[in-house]
Structures are given as C-alpha cells and as structure tokens.
C-alpha cells in the first residue's frame, strides 16, 4: 500500500459522518445547485486527518475496532497519511467547480489555523493554562472554564463551523449564521463527548445548558432542521 491507499482506506472506515452531513444540509437549505459531494468528502478528509494525528498525540492504539494508523503502519507513515488527507481535501475543494471556491479555500485555511492552535493549547494546557492534562479533571474557576471553551471552540467547533460554512458558501449564501450554528454545535458535541468519556459532569452542567440553548437558537436562525 502507498500513502494514498493507506489514507483513503482509513478515511473509509467507520464514523457518523456528521460534518459532511452538516455541509450538505447547509448547502441544500441555501438552495445550492450542483454537486456538493466533493466538498463533503473534503470535510471528511480533514476530520479523518485530525483523527490520525490525534491518535499519535494521545497514544491511542485502536479506533473503529481496528488498530490506529500509527499502530499499524508506524508514526512516520501515519503523519504522512494525515498530511495527505489534508492536502487531498484542499484539492477536492479547488476542483469542486463552485464560483465561491476562493472564499471556500480561505475559510478552510483560517479554520485549520484555529484548529491547530486549539489542539496546541490543549496539548500544552497543563503548563500554558495551568489546566490539568485532560479536561476530565476540569476545575470550576471561571478562567479555567473559559479556557476550556476556547479550546473546544477551536478544536471541535471549528470543524463543524467549517462544514456548515462551506455548504453555505458553495450555495452562494451568507455563511455567517451557518458558521455560528456549527461552532455552537461543535462545542456542545465536545462537552457531551467529554462527559461520556468520564469527565465530571457537575462543572460542565451550566456550560452544557448554555450551549444547548445557543445551538437551538442558531439552528432556528438557519432554519436548517434536523440533519
């Protein structure tokens, strides 16, 4: 297998494909015409690339019931496979044929910058923000909670925000409300994920309610419905 085959094989493994589905829902809600499939595939490539790199950083050995890419092929190959998926995602956007392609590329670039910064702050959190190494021991001070939200927005929120944003841009619509919805949904997704993974729900309860309200408000603003 070459890097392309390793990357695409992993990209085709499990997952709910929530981000591509959100991209498609935003595109359809905005009355888009044309084939959004390539852009949805790009969103999934970006997501799966982040999982490959996350598994290396976290030392996780299994995903989707199978060995992670680094465990199966080694760290250097896994890094290259993740990088290839990012590059392939950009190629898919450039080949999508939408008039807003330059704006879509710019949105993806800015989103990736924020995502990398959020991931970096999460990894450096213990020393940089005086946070514990994982959010599962999340303390309750306002400063630390605000830092947690900032990391969630950039790590997870950005991925959902970009998905909704690209769908709206491809349809020639105003992407701002869709970005707001995706960002709020992504933070709520991360909060729920952290609680499911064993975080103490008590310090997150109020934050969860806040983002449930934000998600509902922005979803209604977009009239995007259930996707």
Language-model segments: what does each one mean?
Residues 1-227:
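All-alpha prenyltransferase/terpene-synthase fold signal
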